[in-house]
């Protein structure tokens, strides 16, 4: 092989705006999936309740998400993030049409990071409660309740999975916006 052959290369036929447009389409797709994950988590947790049947109608044990302020915060946080993601779809579509927009990408990075903090905070706090529901804490006499409230625990655990998946998707959105901005600054 000759040394000159290595220097000869073919230029990419993909334009830089085409790559940015592809990244913007991926951004839109990820936002839609994140909406589904966070909204599904809010709905699943918000409709979680279970009543244990007993011999008498006067004594009933009931578990509802609203009994725990942490779960209420989880539902509100996921609902806020879902609403934000729906509103941000407009900017995501704008970026498909105008791939060189910088100010709106910076705004999206800022708001995506704020929503990531809110979503992760709600999911992490609820994860601690779900862990206690599954495992308990013998030192403080908090016994596991998931043997009795099986459906309640399955729904809350599933809600956490959707919420943490939404967190990962928002991290990807932040990376995509940062990459698109860095590609634009390198071109100027």
UniProtKB/Swiss-Prot annotation:
<keyword id="KW-1003">Cell membrane</keyword>
<feature type="topological domain" description="Extracellular">
    <location>
        <begin position="127"/>
        <end position="159"/>
    </location>
</feature>
<dbReference type="GO" id="GO:0005886">
    <property type="term" value="C:plasma membrane"/>
</dbReference>
<keyword id="KW-0961">Cell wall biogenesis/degradation</keyword>
<keyword id="KW-0325">Glycoprotein</keyword>
<comment type="subunit">
    <text>Homodimer and heterodimers.</text>
</comment>
<feature type="transmembrane region" description="Helical">
    <location>
        <begin position="106"/>
        <end position="126"/>
    </location>
</feature>
<feature type="topological domain" description="Extracellular">
    <location>
        <begin position="46"/>
        <end position="72"/>
    </location>
</feature>
<comment type="function">
    <text>Regulates membrane-cell wall junctions and localized cell wall deposition. Required for establishment of the Casparian strip membrane domain (CSD) and the subsequent formation of Casparian strips, a cell wall modification of the root endodermis that determines an apoplastic barrier between the intraorganismal apoplasm and the extraorganismal apoplasm and prevents lateral diffusion.</text>
</comment>
<dbReference type="InterPro" id="IPR006459">
    <property type="entry name" value="CASP/CASPL"/>
</dbReference>
<dbReference type="InterPro" id="IPR006702">
    <property type="entry name" value="CASP_dom"/>
</dbReference>
<dbReference type="GO" id="GO:0042545">
    <property type="term" value="P:cell wall modification"/>
</dbReference>
<keyword id="KW-0812">Transmembrane</keyword>
<comment type="similarity">
    <text>Belongs to the Casparian strip membrane proteins (CASP) family.</text>
</comment>
<dbReference type="Pfam" id="PF04535">
    <property type="entry name" value="CASP_dom"/>
</dbReference>
<feature type="transmembrane region" description="Helical">
    <location>
        <begin position="73"/>
        <end position="93"/>
    </location>
</feature>
<dbReference type="InterPro" id="IPR044173">
    <property type="entry name" value="CASPL"/>
</dbReference>
<feature type="transmembrane region" description="Helical">
    <location>
        <begin position="160"/>
        <end position="180"/>
    </location>
</feature>
<feature type="transmembrane region" description="Helical">
    <location>
        <begin position="25"/>
        <end position="45"/>
    </location>
</feature>
<feature type="topological domain" description="Cytoplasmic">
    <location>
        <begin position="94"/>
        <end position="105"/>
    </location>
</feature>
<feature type="glycosylation site" description="N-linked (GlcNAc...) asparagine">
    <location>
        <position position="49"/>
    </location>
</feature>
<dbReference type="GO" id="GO:0007043">
    <property type="term" value="P:cell-cell junction assembly"/>
</dbReference>
<keyword id="KW-1133">Transmembrane helix</keyword>
<feature type="topological domain" description="Cytoplasmic">
    <location>
        <begin position="1"/>
        <end position="24"/>
    </location>
</feature>
<protein>
    <recommendedName>
        <fullName>Casparian strip membrane protein 1</fullName>
    </recommendedName>
</protein>
<keyword id="KW-0472">Membrane</keyword>
<feature type="topological domain" description="Cytoplasmic">
    <location>
        <begin position="181"/>
        <end position="188"/>
    </location>
</feature>
